[in-house]
């Protein structure tokens, strides 16, 4: 009986996974720059504590310096910014995707424990934002021809889901506050890493041989009223075009003479 139930659950999970991937494929952009811009904006939004942590602190009456300090001291261990920077792009995307999946689970647990009234609409907004980020992360991996590698789960925990003992309400509130604080900090790190992706691509374009060649070439145009036009291009040598009124165009192959001498 248990084996049949496990098989049914596994089949349902795989079906939902395939459906979510199909929906993500249908809604994916073909522009990497557009996806990167969206991910940066989404990370900035979710990294802002006003989107979730601050409303939670006010709702749970934790808005004192000591209680705020307790939140940071009980923060949940998310992947650090230095760790994220050292990851390859595929592994980074996989880590973000998997971590946000865990965050969704913790938010659902948080709702069940505390928020049985519609007094915390920010929670639903945060959930929709996370789903949007995960979709764009999947699309970015697909656009880069990378499969989302699922990394080994890190040893993290959340005050919203600790159930080894029956904690008092206050400690549970502090634990959940620490989880939200760690989540915002993680998303801020994700946004900074995504901005480094953008800076790296811009720097690569600036340092391309074509741009360097153009940068080393200088054009100077000199016009004399009604008589002649001189166009000079310099990069080691100088070419001069002289056009006189009523005469044909003269184009020397190479010259180091001044326009005045040739005229």
UniProtKB/Swiss-Prot annotation:
Keyword Disulfide bond: yes
Propiece span(s): 207-263
UniProt-annotated location(s): Secreted
Biased composition range(s): Basic residues: 241-252
Alphabetical GO biological process terms: behavioral response to pain; immune response; meiotic nuclear division; negative regulation of hormone secretion; negative regulation of meiotic nuclear division; oncostatin-M-mediated signaling pathway; peripheral nervous system development; positive regulation of apoptotic signaling pathway
Region (Disordered) location: 241-263
Polar residues biased stretches: 253-263
Disulfide bond annotation, renumbered to this chain: 28-139, 71-177
Function comment: Growth regulator. Inhibits the proliferation of a number of tumor cell lines. It regulates cytokine production, including IL-6, G-CSF and GM-CSF from endothelial cells. Uses only type II OSM receptor (heterodimers composed of OSMR and IL6ST). Involved in the maturation of fetal hepatocytes, thereby promoting liver development and regeneration.
Protein name, UniProt field: Oncostatin-M
Species this protein is from: Mus musculus
């Amino acid at each position: 009986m248990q084996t049949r139930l496990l098989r049914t659950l596994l089949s349902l999970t795989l079906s939902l996974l395939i459906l979510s991937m199909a929906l993500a494929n249908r809604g994916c952009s073909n522009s990497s720059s557009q996806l990167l811009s969206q991910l940066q904006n989404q990370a900035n939004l979710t990294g802002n504590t006003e989107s979730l942590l601050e409303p939670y602190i006010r709702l749970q009456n934790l808005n004192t310096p000591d209680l705020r300090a307790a939140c940071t001291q009980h923060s949940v261990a998310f992947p650090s910014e230095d760790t994220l920077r050292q990851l390859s792009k595929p592994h980074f995307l996989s880590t973000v995707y998997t971590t946000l999946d865990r965050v969704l689970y913790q938010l659902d647990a948080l709702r069940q424990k505390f928020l049985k009234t519609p007094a915390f609409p920010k929670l639903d907004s945060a959930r929709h934002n996370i789903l949007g980020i995960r979709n764009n992360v999947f699309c970015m991996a697909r656009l880069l021809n990378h499969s989302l590698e699922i990394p080994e789960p890190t040893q993290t925990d959340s005050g919203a889901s600790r159930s080894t003992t029956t904690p008092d309400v206050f400690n549970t509130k502090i634990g959940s506050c620490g989880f939200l604080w760690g989540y915002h900090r993680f998303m801020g790190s994700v946004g900074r890493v995504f901005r480094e992706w953008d800076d790296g691509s811009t720097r690569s374009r600036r340092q391309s041989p074509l741009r360097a060649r153009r940068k080393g070439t200088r054009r100077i145009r000199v016009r004399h009223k009604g008589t002649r036009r001189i166009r000079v291009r310099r990069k080691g040598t100088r070419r001069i075009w002289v056009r006189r009124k009523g005469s044909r165009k003269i184009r020397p192959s190479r010259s180091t003479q001044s326009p005045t001498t040739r005229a």
